[in-house]
Curated annotation (Swiss-Prot):
Protein name per Swiss-Prot or TrEMBL: DNA-binding protein inhibitor ID-2-A
Species of origin: Xenopus laevis
PROSITE patterns: BHLH
Function, in words: Transcriptional regulator (lacking a basic DNA binding domain) which negatively regulates the basic helix-loop-helix (bHLH) transcription factors by forming heterodimers and inhibiting their DNA binding and transcriptional activity. Inhibits the activity of both neurogenic (neurod1/neuroD) and myogenic (myod1/myoD) bHLH factors. May play a role in the regulation of the circadian clock.
Any Gene Ontology CC annotation: protein-containing complex
UniProt xrefs under Gene3D superfamilies: Helix-loop-helix DNA-binding domain
Domain bHLH: 23-75
Length: 133
């Protein structure tokens, strides 16, 4: 029977884990930390793009999303009130229906959004909570 030293077996298993870790991290879907960093990058990009978000102040993800929603609504109002667009609305459409109904009603009440976020976060498992700050 051949005996192995504990140092050698630890080294052997760490190499195996290391090589498996490299193989596993090839796709972003398999690496939750990569997904988290990608989401944080997206929030940073949104913060840069929306002019009403203060750039020199730390804002929460919920605040960023609220600013984005408000900005989109402002852009929609601006487009709807633009003279060239208004004149297009008075032309009959080929489809017959002149107004578009939203797929779902927009919720602009931040207190309700905060409550929904609290309910959503309670559904996370302990493992997923450790991934999200």
């Amino acid at each position: 029977m051949k005996a192995f030293s504990p140092v050698r077996s630890v080294r052997k298993s760490s190499l195996t884990e290391h090589s498996l870790g490299i193989a596993r991290s090839k796709t972003p879907v398999d690496d939750p930390m990569s997904l988290l960093y990608n989401m944080n990058d997206c929030y940073s990009k949104l913060k840069e793009l929306v002019p009403s978000i203060p750039q020199n102040k730390k804002v929460s993800k919920m605040e960023i999303l609220q600013h984005v929603i408000d900005y989109i609504l402002d852009l929609q109002l601006t487009l709807d009130s633009h003279p060239s667009i208004v004149s297009l609305h008075h032309l009959p459409r080929v489809g017959g229906n002149t107004s578009r109904t939203p797929l779902t009603p927009l919720n602009t009440d931040i207190s309700i959004l905060s409550l929904q976020a609290a309910e959503f976060s309670s559904e996370f498992t302990d493992e997923s909570k450790s991934l999200c700050p």
